[in-house]
Amino acid sequence: MNSNIEKSDKPSFIKISEQPSLYDDLEKKSVREILEDINKEDQKVAIAVQKAIPQIEKLVTQIVPRMKQGGRIFYMGAGTSGRLGVLDASEIPPTFGMPPTLIIGLIAGGDTALRNPVENAEDNTTRGWEELTEHNINDKDTVIGIAASGTTPYVIGAMHAAREHGILTGCITSNPNSPMAAEADIPIEMIVGPEYVTGSSRMKSGTGQKMILNMITTSVMIQLGRVKGNKMVNMQLSNRKLVDRGTRMIIEELGLEYDKAKALLLMHGSVKKAIDAYKAG
């Protein structure tokens, strides 16, 4: 027997996200063939996300009570994964009227990395935790790592330190049994399969990550009372389109004339506040 071979009960880690594409000779295909192939692969993403719903539910149900006590969400990632975390976090203030400090996206390499690659940033195992401590992270907060491969050192280092400090950790990955998932209290494994262009995780993996991030923040915000019926009653009135939309929400709820509803909205600054003030007399 080879003494270098060790038996292990741990499930094997397979980088499915980097396996060869199911398609070849892409440069020989017509534009229509390429588009249809990509669309065919994209249809697998929603199915993979659906299978992950039980884990997404577990994470959301742990996040909500923490946020009711003043907790926050920190997304952590590199490259596409980091950018998607920043994107989702940046949509929370305008959509739900919450402060930008409630859900924070951190990307390896900082804001520069949103547009340009930052060399070796994702390989730094300590910088992620340093950034979290700069935000005074505490045990009411949640850290969610995002990495298709599940191997990003910047993310894994931060999650490991967070767990050591009793902070809830989750993750979104496209590979089973990854090192990142090992650092997550609640791992979300979204197995979308090989990418159309081998290893290009901005494709199916990125699409699935965005879907799951939407699900997490939308369900959390609904649970926190930031939606009424099916409407964004706490949205920020940052342009004429949204002022008009908010005005029509008030008309639907209160039956007022347009000008009166708009004046009420502008006076109180949000649909919810305007409706509550009107009903209070």
UniProtKB/Swiss-Prot annotation:
Pathway: Amino-sugar metabolism; N-acetylmuramate degradation. Keywords: Carbohydrate metabolism, Lyase. Gene3D superfamilies: Glucose-6-phosphate isomerase like protein, domain 1. One of its GO terms (biological process) is peptidoglycan turnover. Residues 63-226 form the SIS domain. The active site is at E91 (proton donor), E122. Belongs to the GCKR-like family. MurNAc-6-P etherase subfamily. Homodimer. It catalyses: N-acetyl-D-muramate 6-phosphate + H2O = N-acetyl-D-glucosamine 6-phosphate + (R)-lactate. Specifically catalyzes the cleavage of the D-lactyl ether substituent of MurNAc 6-phosphate, producing GlcNAc 6-phosphate and D-lactate. Its EC number is 4.2.1.126. This is N-acetylmuramic acid 6-phosphate etherase. Signal peptide: none annotated. It is an enzyme of class 4 (lyase). NCBIfam families: N-acetylmuramic acid 6-phosphate etherase (TIGR00274), PRK05441.1 (NF003915), PRK12570.1 (NF009222). GO terms for molecular function: carbohydrate derivative binding; carbon-oxygen lyase activity; ether hydrolase activity. A lyase-type mechanism (elimination/hydration) is suggested for the cleavage of the lactyl ether bond of MurNAc 6-phosphate, with the formation of an alpha,beta-unsaturated aldehyde intermediate with (E)-stereochemistry, followed by the syn addition of water to give product.
